[in-house]
Amino acid sequence: MISSNDFRPGVSIVLDGSVWRVIDFLHVKPGKGSAFVRTTLKNVQSGKVLEKTFRAGETVPQATLEKITMQHTYKEGDEFVFMDMESYEEGRLSASQIGDRVKYLKEGMEVNVIRWGEQVLEVELANSVVLEVIQTDPGVKGDTATGGTKPAIVETGATVMVPLFISQGERIKIDTRDDKYLGRE
């Protein structure tokens, strides 16, 4: 159990049978009446955002989350097969469980899997990945009227906007959080 006075961004709680992460909180002490904590919560499974108010000192169950380092070994049909780096057990996850970062997942990559009990809540990739450009238009000299970027398709199939000087076959570093080009590798 955790007190509402101990809420901080990133704390996970159990509310109505599902896991919610505290995004923001505000401790309010009105001149008249008792203090309360106004929170913004995000459902870890569905992504739904909720505004909820708790009485100051109210206790709620804290979610005990387990973070496991796993390695993506291969893809079989619509499922991705991962191996636990400590116990060497295999686990399977669907693309919907991995989320939109599946476009940067390649074989041999290590990820952190966040579990609550036996249920997988989310898959965390590294903040940046290095991938090879497999298709992009050649940059034409003097063609900078559009801001100097062009689309490029990387080895995992994701499309990223890159500078005009990037050519096919180059390895580039990409930020997985906002799909931005970070540099050559």
UniProtKB/Swiss-Prot annotation:
It comes from the Bacteria. GO terms for molecular function: translation elongation factor activity. It is found in: Cytoplasm. GO terms for biological process: peptide biosynthetic process. One of its GO terms (cellular component) is cytoplasm. Keywords: Cytoplasm, Elongation factor, Protein biosynthesis. The keyword Transferase does not apply. Pfam families: EFP, EFP_N, Elong-fact-P_C. InterPro entries: Elong-fact-P_C (IPR015365), NA-bd_OB-fold (IPR012340), Rib_uL2_dom2 (IPR014722), Transl_elong_fac_P/YeiP (IPR020599), Transl_elong_KOW-like (IPR013185), Transl_elong_P/YeiP_cen (IPR001059), Transl_elong_P/YeiP_CS (IPR013852), Transl_elongation_fac_P (IPR011768). Pathway: Protein biosynthesis; polypeptide chain elongation. Its main location: cytoplasm. Disulfide bonds: none annotated. Involved in peptide bond synthesis. Stimulates efficient translation and peptide-bond synthesis on native or reconstituted 70S ribosomes in vitro. Probably functions indirectly by altering the affinity of the ribosome for aminoacyl-tRNA, thus increasing their reactivity as acceptors for peptidyl transferase. Belongs to the elongation factor P family. This is Elongation factor P. It comes from Trichormus variabilis (strain ATCC 29413 / PCC 7937) (Anabaena variabilis). The lineage of its organism: Bacteria, Bacillati, Cyanobacteriota, Cyanophyceae, Nostocales. The gene is efp.
